[in-house]
Amino acid sequence: MAAPALRAARRWSGLALGVRCAVWNLPGITQVRWSRYAPEFRDPLIDKEHYRKQVSELTEEEKYDLELKKTQLIKAAAATETSSVFADPVISKFTNMMMKGGNKVLARSLMAQTLEAVKRKQFEKYRAASAEEQATIERNPYKIFHEALRNCEPVIGLVPILKGGHFYQVPVPLADRRRRFLAMKWMITECRENKPRRMLMPEKLSHELLEAFHNRGPVIKRKHNMHKMAEANRALAHYRWW
């Protein structure tokens, strides 16, 4: 009985001191890809409206869930989750895609400067317009950003499929998540590769967003080119099922 314990002790003593301390300080190991939390931990609920409800307004199921939370363990909220009224998941995703080298502070600063530049340009246009034209000018940079991305989203894409030793570009309908990703990728690529040397990123990005908002610009042209290629390869559409 003592032999296995002695062999285990010798293996542990052979490790370096730092490795032994790191192993001993590991949290409880689970079977789900070394998760930090055990299966009994619950996901956090980040919703101010839920916590503002009075107990008398809760349903029986919500009251039971509230009693369970008093004795259950709750996971820590992720650093990217927030209950702020200014939180926007689409802008957050765009900021992450624009980030380089993990410098998220710089990416957030560029995004804030871009939205500010969009608003300034629209207000200059608003003040110079007549009373009739002012009603048609959008000044909210968040609405302009979302509408510009929607205008850049392609409906149909091309997927390479191998048939007979050759790759064919087969047109397929794109999911919403893929459409949004391509629109963001094209916008960021256009601003990085075709930006004048002395032009700052917020200035270029704000210009491209306003162009896309009015269905103009190189990003819109790139979307139309993809649609034309999909239309030209419509004879290969049946390769999706064969």
From Swiss-Prot:
Organism: Rattus norvegicus (Rat)
Ribosomal protein in keyword set: yes
Classification via CDD domains: uS7_Mitochondria_Mammalian
Family statement drawn from the similarity comment of this UniProt entry: Belongs to the universal ribosomal protein uS7 family.
Transit peptide: 1-37
GO molecular function: mRNA binding; rRNA binding; structural constituent of ribosome
Cystine pairs: none
Protein name per UniProt: Small ribosomal subunit protein uS7m
Protein location: Mitochondrion
Primary subcellular site in the record, as a coarse category: mitochondrion
Example GO biological process: translation
Entry-annotated residues carrying N6-acetyllysine: K228
Keyword Transmembrane: no
Alphabetic keyword roster: Acetylation, Mitochondrion, Ribonucleoprotein, Ribosomal protein, Transit peptide
Entry's Gene Ontology cellular component terms: mitochondrial small ribosomal subunit; ribosome
Quaternary structure annotation from Swiss-Prot or TrEMBL: Component of the mitochondrial ribosome small subunit (28S) which comprises a 12S rRNA and about 30 distinct proteins.
Record-linked PANTHER family: RIBOSOMAL PROTEIN S7 (PTHR11205)
UniProt lineage: Eukaryota, Metazoa, Chordata, Craniata, Vertebrata
Source taxon at top rank: Eukaryota
